[in-house]
Amino acid sequence: MSTSARRRLMRDFKRMQTDPPAGVSASPVADNVMTWNAVIIGPADTPFEDGTFRLVMHFEEQYPNKPPGVKFISQMFHPNVYGTGELCLDILQNRWSPTYDVAAILTSIQSLLNDPNTSSPANVEASNLYKDNRKEYIKRVRETVEKSWED
């Protein structure tokens, strides 16, 4: 069944293959273009450096008019990531635009890693450490980086 969402996702996939953004990758799971596996590499010169963080993206038939659900599969200690792995990111909610594609979503998440929004935290502990005890925050992040290699 060919829908506009599926056609758009195939275009997104083609772009990820031909012009991949640095430090991110994604592709549909076998036999289901509506579910994607993705990987974000922790940005250099950040506490997340060298981390390999796995995510899953779920698209509905309303895509690109409705944002996908995005969730970290890898453990993540970050002010804007819930314990469930779900993200609190404005472009996946009230600031969504149909012009965003998979590459834009993943690069936004990658940028969020080192530039969290502490005014609206999903993980209060991570947010408080980020603001008040950066050394401990970095230690906890580095622990998740090491765990990401085992996932």
UniProtKB/Swiss-Prot annotation:
User: What Pfam families does the record point to?
Assistant: UQ_con
Q: Which InterPro entries match?
A: Ub_conjugating_enzyme, UBQ-conjugat_E2_core, UBQ-conjugating_AS, UBQ-conjugating_enzyme/RWD
Kindly list the places in or outside the cell where this protein is found, as annotated in its UniProt entry.
Answer: Cytoplasm; Nucleus
User: Gene3D superfamilies attached here?
Assistant: Ubiquitin Conjugating Enzyme
Q: Which residues form the active site?
A: 88 (glycyl thioester intermediate)
Q: Does the keyword Transcription regulation apply?
A: yes
Q: Which UniProt keywords apply?
A: ATP-binding, Chromatin regulator, Cytoplasm, DNA damage, DNA repair, Nucleotide-binding, Nucleus, Sporulation, Transcription, Transcription regulation, Transferase, Ubl conjugation pathway
For whether the record's keyword set contains Transcription, the answer is yes
Task: Specify where it is mainly localized.
Answer: cytoplasm
CDD domains attached to this UniProt entry:
UBCc_UBE2A_2B
Describe which pathway this protein belongs to, using the record's wording: Protein modification; protein ubiquitination
- Where are the residues of the annotated region Disordered? 1-26
GO MF entry, a single one = single-stranded DNA helicase activity
* Cellular-component GO terms for this entry: chromosome, telomeric region; cytoplasm; HULC complex; MUB1-RAD6-UBR2 ubiquitin ligase complex; nucleus; Rad6-Rad18 complex; RAD6-UBR2 ubiquitin ligase complex; UBR1-RAD6 ubiquitin ligase complex
Q: Which SUPFAM superfamilies match?
A: UBC-like
Report the EC code(s) recorded for this entry: 2.3.2.23
User: GO biological process: what's one of them?
Assistant: protein polyubiquitination
Reported function:
Catalyzes the covalent attachment of ubiquitin to other proteins. Plays a role in transcription regulation by catalyzing the monoubiquitination of histone H2B to form H2BK123ub1. H2BK123ub1 gives a specific tag for epigenetic transcriptional activation and is also a prerequisite for H3K4me and H3K79me formation. Also involved in postreplication repair of UV-damaged DNA, in N-end rule-dependent protein degradation and in sporulation.
Q: Which family does it belong to?
A: Belongs to the ubiquitin-conjugating enzyme family.
PANTHER family per UniProt: UBIQUITIN-CONJUGATING ENZYME E2 (PTHR24067)
Protein name (Swiss-Prot/TrEMBL): Ubiquitin-conjugating enzyme E2 2
